[in-house]
Design a protein with these regions (language model features):
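Hydrophobic beta-strand-centered segment that forms part of the acyl-chain substrate-binding groove
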Residues: 50, 63-103
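Short, charged/polar low-complexity linear motifs in solvent-exposed/disordered segments
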Residues: 31-32, 43, 71-72, 77-79, ...
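Terminal targeting signals and extreme-terminal segments of soluble enzymes
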Residues: 26, 33, 61-62, 70-71
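HotDog/MaoC-like acyl-thioester-processing domains
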Residues: 1-11, 92-151
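Catalytic strand-loop segment that frames the active site of acyl-thioester-processing enzymes
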Residues: 1-53, 127, 143
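Short, conserved micro-motifs enriched in small and acidic residues
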Residues: 52-60
Length: 151
């Protein structure tokens, strides 16, 4: 059976200050130039009073935390290649503003050895400790070809 090298409760954290450049680069890559993200004048008139980062950018930061967990497992030597099956129950609970410092916590919450999957609880907090985004992430630990274990 494929070794997953993760255990219930294993956790990693990733932190970043979300800047204007991050948001504009994300808008450029995705084509999402919504006024919510790039139009300062428009957003000053809104309830928020300022531009907000894309929710999907927060999912990108969740992916960074997932990669950190995978890298930790790879360092132990694997006979599988972990791949993302996706995110469930993604919710954006509060806005993330330019200049906010976010902290993503990625914690293994379930292991299904028969299906070679792990599930993680993912939480994103801002610098004030407010929960701004949540999700569940599913990893599939795909067995390598015999004799071709991951480095």
């Amino acid at each position: 059976m494929t070794a997953m090298h993760v255990a219930l409760g294993d956790s990693v954290r990733f932190g970043k200050t979300v800047g204007e450049t991050d948001v504009y680069m994300f808008a450029g890559v995705t084509g999402d130039f919504s006024g919510n993200h790039v139009d300062e004048v428009y957003m000053k008139k809104s309830k928020y009073g300022q531009r907000i980062a894309h929710g999907a950018l927060m999912v990108g930061y969740m992916s960074t935390a997932s990669t950190m967990m995978i890298d930790r497992a790879l360092a132990k030597g694997l006979d599988s290649t972990p791949v993302s099956l996706g995110y469930d129950r993604v919710r954006f609970l509060a806005p993330v503003f330019f200049g906010d410092s976010i902290r993503v916590t990625y914690t293994i919450s379930e292991i299904d050895r028969d299906r070679q999957r792990s599930r993680a609880k993912v939480e994103v907090h801002n610098q004030h400790g407010d929960l701004v985004a949540v999700a569940e992430h599913i990893l599939k630990w795909v067995p390598d070809k015999p004799g071709e274990a991951a480095a």
